[in-house]
Amino acid sequence: MGLIVQKFGGTSVGSTEKIRNAAERVIAEREAGHDVVVVVSAMGKSTDVLVDLAKELTDDPSKREMDMLLATGEQVTISLLAMALQARGYDAISFTGWQAGMKTEHVHGNARIVDIDESRIKEELSAGKVVVVAGFQGIADDLHITTLGRGGSDTTAVALAAALKADKCDIYTDVPGVFTTDPRYVSSARKLAGISYDEMLELANLGAGVLHPRAVEFAKNYQVPLEVRSSIENESGTLIEEESSMEQNLVVRGIAFEDQITRVTVCGLSSGLSTLSTIFTTLAKQNINVDIIIQSVTSTNQTSISFSVKTDDLSKTVEVLEEYKGALGYEQIETESKLAKVSIVGSGMVSNPGVAAEMFAVLAQKDIQVKMVSTSEIKVSTVVGRDDMVKAVEALHDAFDLSKVSAAAHS
């Protein structure tokens, strides 16, 4: 007998019918002899509905009261799922985040988990109950309710699995696993049987929405085996674990991409690290996420800096740079929108030199201009024209043989 933590996202519990389906997944694990802790999100789009209600009353709601409001969404789901299990003859009890011992820092809207008192959950498990826990929420030392921000239910599930020393954490979603790339754009995309923590973390940070980066980081730090599974089809999903446990036959394991990227170039800066520090510190204070950065210095010691931002952040970026023009002393700002970022990810790059060269050769063959490049040990990212995005992904997917990936079930 083992302990399984299951997590069901909003789309997987979006109706009473889907909640019944989730209950059957729980029952299957109980029938297999496992103890089960279930973490759930708010039903469907109910969090958006709550946000809209607040907006009807005020343009600037208190962050504390927003956390109080949003935390009610998961409370609906936990009670309904517990009822569904009880109706099938299985003893179940629902807990809010704070009842489950989820202790966080005192930050409203994006709190981090600092400790978990798992004693109450263990007590109920020992009594033979299924414990249903509200994701996305916790409580600070001063007893204020907090929420964990985007991906908070994933993080709750992984944190509980770590604290309880669970054998596994299953993340149920509306997709059957992690794919080599987005199958909505590339029909030859294949489901991966396995992927390493590091690869999944890169893909998550690059916008692959299956798992939140914070949850993957938690799983890696505490060595929690994760499986992303379909809440609809009863089949194996994608197992996320250490690289040493996996087949290492793939140089590239996945391709991530996102559009709505803009390149900003600040021309004619006086060279010096203090100038660069001023630019990026100022942008960071405005919560502008700067991605790829390229610096060039002319023979006359003039510096230009190019960097990419989300297109939604462009106007704020330009506004900040213009405000500090006197301090920065640049000549002009140039921008280029309608861009996209395409990234290849794979632990096999570490021991296979020449992957970036192959990527650029493939893109050149397709007459796709590469405007910016960024690399890490297991990732190469390029910025290309938005109109070339899907063509680039398809070409790279084909070149690295990702359509031939086997989705063989793991044990």
Predicted regions and their residues:
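Phosphate/diphosphate-binding glycine-rich loops and adjacent basic-rich segments that engage nucleotide
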Residues: A134, L192-A193, E202-Q260
